[in-house]
């Protein structure tokens, strides 16, 4: 009886019992409803192979795909006061920060990476929407400025990947202060004669579009990205009119001269490397694909 209880029954249970499946093993395509295996999606830089839909991507994954051989070094996040306003809504702001830090492993919504693309050294500043919607607060603002200062120090071009819902309401006026501060950092980079390329990803809205996200020398948008100051629903409720189809999409903005080109994430590295070589007068690789045609 002991043999049956201790050996046979566990064997049967292991054969017939339900196996635990890891979370997010399959990802649903928001545009078609298709289920995509997570590993297939990751190997394609989180772009749905069949539809081309660009899923949101974490900052460290983006840096890994962007830099040569996935190798880069990150700058230590600057220290700022955590909750100077002692803000509370449904929960304390400081508790919310701790929760996001625990879930994401990040200090705030910005990661600065140093590395090369096709051998060209650059600084990349990446905004991560998974950390409080990529919102711009003191920590994120200080990290953005840190990236610009490092680019100036090393005399490197800076590529910024914007993804944000706007200013961080829990920090009030201290959040809004980051708009002029980051704008000054952009001007410092340009005065140093260094190239500034902005990649607008889904979504890029709110205060970031009123500051550093729209001040680049070249603006590239990922396909299907929502880009604008206020969201379309807010605008429709304000003006009481229906907006044009595709309004505030990256394709709409390129057609109307607000961005220079729309480029798939799969082609971003080659496109940006080619632009860097042209703009910095480096020898171009004739095998690299030409950048997509820019908007008028």
Swiss-Prot record:
SS bond list: none
Q: In which pathway does it act?
A: Lipid metabolism; malonyl-CoA biosynthesis; malonyl-CoA from acetyl-CoA: step 1/1
Which GO terms of the molecular function aspect are on file?
acetyl-CoA carboxylase activity; ATP binding; carboxyl- or carbamoyltransferase activity
The residues covered by the CoA carboxyltransferase N-terminal domain are: 25-294
- Where does it localize? Cytoplasm
Q: Which reaction does it catalyse?
A: N(6)-carboxybiotinyl-L-lysyl-[protein] + acetyl-CoA = N(6)-biotinyl-L-lysyl-[protein] + malonyl-CoA
Which Pfam families does the entry mention?
Answer: Carboxyl_trans (PF01039)
Known NCBIfam families for this protein? accD
The Swiss-Prot or TrEMBL record describes its family as follows: Belongs to the AccD/PCCB family.
The role this protein plays is: Component of the acetyl coenzyme A carboxylase (ACC) complex. Biotin carboxylase (BC) catalyzes the carboxylation of biotin on its carrier protein (BCCP) and then the CO(2) group is transferred by the transcarboxylase to acetyl-CoA to form malonyl-CoA.
UniProt protein name: Acetyl-coenzyme A carboxylase carboxyl transferase subunit beta
Q: Highest lineage ranks of the organism?
A: Bacteria, Pseudomonadati, Pseudomonadota, Alphaproteobacteria, Hyphomicrobiales
């Amino acid at each position: 009886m002991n043999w049956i209880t201790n050996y046979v029954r566990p064997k049967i249970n292991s054969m017939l019992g339900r196996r635990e499946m890891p979370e997010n093993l399959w990802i649903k395509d928001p545009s078609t409803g298709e289920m995509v295996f997570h590993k297939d999606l990751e190997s394609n830089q989180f772009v749905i192979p069949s539809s081309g839909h660009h899923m949101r991507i974490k900052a460290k994954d983006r840096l890994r795909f962007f830099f040569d051989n996935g190798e880069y070094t990150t700058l230590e996040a600057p220290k700022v006061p955590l909750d100077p306003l002692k803000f509370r809504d449904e929960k304390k702001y400081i508790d919310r920060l701790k929760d996001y830090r625990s879930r994401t492993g990040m200090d705030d919504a910005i990661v600065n990476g140093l590395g090369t693309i096709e051998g060209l050294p650059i600084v990349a500043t990446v905004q991560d929407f998974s950390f409080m919607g990529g919102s711009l607060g003191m920590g994120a603002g200080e990290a953005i400025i840190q990236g610009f200062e490092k680019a100036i120090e090393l005399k490197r071009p800076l590529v910024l990947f914007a993804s944000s819902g706007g200013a961080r309401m829990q920090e009030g006026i201290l959040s809004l202060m980051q708009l002029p501060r980051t704008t000054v950092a952009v001007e410092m980079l340009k005065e140093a004669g260094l190239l500034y390329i902005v990649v607008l990803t889904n979504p890029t809205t709110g205060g970031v579009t009123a500051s550093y996200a729209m001040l680049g020398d070249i603006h590239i948008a990922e396909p299907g990205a929502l880009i604008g100051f206020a969201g379309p629903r807010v605008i429709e409720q304000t003006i009481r009119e229906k907006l044009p189809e595709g309004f505030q999409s990256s394709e709409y903005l390129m057609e109307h001269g607000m961005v220079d080109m729309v480029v798939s994430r799969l082609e971003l590295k080659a496109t940006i490397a080619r632009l860097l070589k042209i703009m910095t007068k480096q020898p171009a690789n004739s095998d690299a694909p030409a950048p997509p045609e820019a908007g008028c």
